[in-house]
């Protein structure tokens, strides 16, 4: 999840499965965009998909990846560093994101960086 007001470094690039410029804000998000690009079951994806009517915020948050599979199903992915999982705000936002998407009948998945 990303707050649209955050002022962090953004890497921009073009990938064939994303119609817009792919903007990634950390290593986990960058690496997972490559995974989605190579995944044969993913038809297309949107990076930093805006959340409307999202609880806890004023609508300024995005889901990291909103994906459409070849079967037409929607799957969303949130990317997070392992060290941030224990932070109360991160846990609260991830839980809210999961509930937001599950209420809409969308499969929700979490992507975590490798353990070192």
Identify the role of each PLM range.
Residues 1-116:
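Electrostatic, structured charged patches in enzyme active sites and in nucleic-acid/phosphate-binding
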